[in-house]
Amino acid sequence: MNSAVNESAIIRSVRETLARAERKEREIPRPAVTLSYAQSLDGCISANKGRPTAISGNQSILITHQLRAMHNAILVGINTVLVDDPSLTVRHVDGENPIPVVLDSQLRTPPHAKLLQQIEKQVIIATLPGASYERESKLVKAGARVIRIPEAGGGGILLTELFRWLREQNVNSLMIEGGAKVISSVLAESLGDQLVLTIAPKFFGRSGVRAVETLNCVRPTSRPCLTDVEYERIGDDMLVWGRLVLDNAVAADG
């Protein structure tokens, strides 16, 4: 891949939105959040549960690495780590690696995971207060920093508290790449500022893993939607960008 990448209109929109979101005063402090992932035409982020799936084309992958270079930190869920074993670094383009953050309520991250092999940025693993201290010790020896975050009401890690903690660590911008549970939670809790969605010309069918699961929205009569939407063809893929807002005009189901 060629590291000389021209900045697209969508990348410029992302940069401008990050700058505004970082300055925004919030009731609960958090970083500016960019939700970014790739899906098939039928809304799947994987062809089969538990198996890695190549979705984006080469040109779209370059965009993903540009986005990584624009953020202080990058977050994924434990299933993404176990299935894809990502490094979460910036490659193919110039830029600094973001701080890797993993949501791992049971500390299942393998000490030999690729993201723990990069020494430039220490990996942050967010877990629950009751997680195994023996597993924590192994991950700390592997180079990770383990932090314990309160549990959310419906289970899992309380994202608002994690994001507050990240902001206190001077993480001003956070890119979220998945997986499905993380994507759904960020949308349901209105914790994102913008979405960068890559749509590949593929179908995965019934066996595919949906990008968005049930949206248990904090405000039941509102749903997340995009505004100021932009579209751009990148190779055979379609890139969609927009600011994430709540559509307060949406009526309750039924």
What are these regions (language model features)?
Residues M1-G254:
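Enzymes that bind and transform nitrogen-containing heteroaromatic metabolites
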